[in-house]
Amino acid sequence: MKKTALYLLAALALTGCKKTQATADGDAAQQSTEQAGATQADAEKLLTPEQIAQQWAKGGAVSVKGGGEKPDIVTLVSAFNKAWPTDVTTTLLESAKDPKFTEYVNEDTGGGMACDRGNGYVSVSAGDTDEDCMEAAVWKRKNGHRLFIINLVSTNPDNRSLPEKQALCIYDYDPKTETMTPEENAVSKFRASADDLKLMYRLPRKGTDLTIGEANEEREDALWHFFEWNGSQFSEAIAYTEKELTKKIEGSWMCKDSDEPMLTFNIVADDANGPQIEDCAIYGSTEYDAFVYTWDGTLIISENGDSGEDRNPAIYCQFRLTKQDELTGTYYLRQNGGNETKGTITLKRGNPAW
């Protein structure tokens, strides 16, 4: 029973009212039932990411009372949660009531929460559970508005690295009206390149650029697309493209031994089923040889057989670009039995490979 109720009972006793213990217990039971009913009613109002995805487009604007000119990320998430209440955002906001709260990590599950007000970012991760998760971030616009994005995800119990269902909600916040209005942009319009690929959104905690990955159950390594922020809007997705070599390296070369990748990149590997999304890195290893063909911009990593044996290609790579116009990677090679040589590969943006 609440303290106020206890104080009231004490006052009634002092004034001679005959409030029996049985009656008090009955009141407590009734109050407990009412609280349980209220909790159940609140739970019934909570929406799943799938429900929000189905209804959000028709939801309209969201009021942000007291948002002012510089609303922080918690204020915007709170306004969203009033219009579209979910368990995961409610949980985050409960912790965010403490202005000093920044992070929580569940050591048992690997999940947790982050509340970075300074960088305009919050998240809830599921770890190795099947709970829902979310990310939200805010961007400053040159016209004084804010771009607010929140992504709510239902975890796939069979593959936690891929979303089961998700709701990506994007708003423009107007400080004059203290209102968030749904917005379409390059991110919301982006579609997967194949029907069996799912999209994975990654909002930035630091920096301003956003990434979207494509992956499926068979191939978990995502092909990432980058969206650059220009202060007002996102660019169209930057295509991954074929590479050009800045230095011609001929012959058979072996990578220098290394525990860290010397160059990482996405590739498209052709097999009997057509183009396949691959994620690749050049690691230093004595078990593989690197063959570089400069005339068509391809690289073959092959198994390292005994001296004099033919080597069958293990991976046939066509480099694809990350977000930069130009990306240069340096790695060290040594010819079989020879001296170590430094090689450089530069990737440049061109026409999409497919």
What are these regions (language model features)?
Residues 259-297:
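N-terminal glycine/threonine-rich, aromatic-flanked beta-hairpin/loop signature
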Residues 142-185:
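Mid-length scaffold segments of soluble, non-membrane domains
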Residues 24-140:
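Terminal domain-start segments
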Residues 179-243, 290-292, 301-320:
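Short aromatic loop motif centered on NTY/YTY
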Residues 15-16:
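C-terminal motif of bacterial Sec signal peptides marking the signal peptidase cleavage site
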Residues 226-227, 231-235, 240-245, 288, ...:
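Edge beta-strand at a domain terminus
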Residues 240-254, 266-272, 322, 351-354:
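N-terminal helix-cap/turn-to-beta initiation motif at the start of protein domains
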Residues 135-143, 200-206:
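Structural signature of eukaryotic scaffold interfaces centered on beta-propeller domains
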